[in-house]
């Protein structure tokens, strides 16, 4: 709908509202993947994670922080409307950076995020007492869940790390051009460069039949999962 925003003032207003709402949600909890309208709680309040009444579900996925940036960027590029990049946006991008860096696991092998659910579906909860399989801190960002809401096997989810790289660079452009925040923009660019370098080093598999291909998930220790998922972002 973004490409039609300049032709429909009400559509443009709605898109701006969605963007602002997404930034607000990030600031409520950057680890959550689904939110309530207000603070009414929901069916997953019994999950063993840091649930809040504003949250519907708290499955940590990298792409949950990337899509709001991508939408806001293309809205701005199409309409020229920079009003969405307010203080809420600046707080949101600060939370994005903080969360991505926490999930690089450099300072803490486990990170602050943990998730368990009483369920019959193995992929609806995390192994290892809610921490997931271990990862080696190599510069990649850990994602507990895939865009499908299924738990990752190895937490360095490659397509979502690529998505983080492009999203951080979009954020840097906004911060430089609109907000005049070069230091914050530089932080985004530096993290994007670090993740991209790590992807080239750790996400490539030398397949006996197909040669060099990207793995779907890796852990930094040398384990690689060769598959793709129907959801986006995917390797395809």
Model-derived regions: residue spans:
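Catalytic cores of carbohydrate-active enzymes
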Residues: 29, 33, 101-118, 156, ...
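Solvent-exposed, flexible loop/coil residues
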Residues: 88, 117-119, 145, 149, ...
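Active-site-adjacent bridging/hinge elements
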Residues: 39-48, 134-146
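Amphipathic, well-ordered alpha-helical segments in soluble domains
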Residues: 18, 64-71, 160-163, 167-171, ...
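Solvent-exposed loop and edge beta-strand segments that line ligand/cofactor-binding
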Residues: 1, 11-12, 51-63, 147-161, ...
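Aromatic-rich carbohydrate-recognition surfaces in CAZymes
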Residues: 1-124
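Inter-helical turn/loop segments and adjacent helix faces that build the functional surface
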Residues: 4-9, 75-88, 151, 155, ...
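Flexible glycine-/small-residue-enriched beta->alpha junction loops
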Residues: 65, 120-144
């Amino acid at each position: 709908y973004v490409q039609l925003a300049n032709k429909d003032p009400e559509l443009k207003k709605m898109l701006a509202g969605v963007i602002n709402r997404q930034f607000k949600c990030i600031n409520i909890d950057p680890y959550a993947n689904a939110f309530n309208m207000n603070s009414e709680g929901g069916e997953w309040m019994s999950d063993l994670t840091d649930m809040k009444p504003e949250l519907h579900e708290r499955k940590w996925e990298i792409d949950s922080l990337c899509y709001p940036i991508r939408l806001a960027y293309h809205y701005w590029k199409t309409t020229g409307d920079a009003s969405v990049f307010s203080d809420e946006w600046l707080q949101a991008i600060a939370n994005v950076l903080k969360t991505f860096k926490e999930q690089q696991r450099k300072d803490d092998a486990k990170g602050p995020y943990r998730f368990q659910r009483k369920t019959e579906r193995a992929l609806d909860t995390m192994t290892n007492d809610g921490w997931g399989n271990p990862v080696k801190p190599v510069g990649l960002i850990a994602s507990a869940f895939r865009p499908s809401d299924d738990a990752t096997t190895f937490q360095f989810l490659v397509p979502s790390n690529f998505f983080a790289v492009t999203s951080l660079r979009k954020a840097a452009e906004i911060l430089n051009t609109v907000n005049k925040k070069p230091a914050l923009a530089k932080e985004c660019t530096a993290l994007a460069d670090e993740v991209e370098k790590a992807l080239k080093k750790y996400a490539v598999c030398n397949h006996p039949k197909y040669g060099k291909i990207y793995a779907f998930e890796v852990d930094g220790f040398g384990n690689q999962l060769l598959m793709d998922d129907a959801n986006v972002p995917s390797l395809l």
